[in-house]
């Protein structure tokens, strides 16, 4: 059985974190999914999260949300 590559794992975890971050924004603000996605995808955290070398994607979505809110 093939092991997933580091890139595949990073992509999976990043996508999971992004979906959870959108949920958190909606729960906290009551905004639409489109607005929540805009807030997440346009946040400074987005660039940091996509940097595989920084490995921020291994942090929990709750922790990432706290970082995003700062």
Residue ranges and their predicted role:
Residues 1-70:
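C-terminal alpha-helical interaction appendages
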């Amino acid at each position: 059985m093939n092991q997933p590559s580091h890139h595949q794992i990073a992509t999976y975890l990043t996508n999971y974190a992004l979906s959870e971050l959108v949920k958190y924004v909606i729960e906290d603000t009551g905004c639409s999914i489109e607005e929540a996605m805009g807030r997440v995808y346009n946040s400074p955290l987005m660039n940091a999260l996509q940097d595989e070398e920084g490995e921020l994607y291994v942090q929990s979505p709750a922790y990432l949300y706290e970082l995003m809110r700062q």
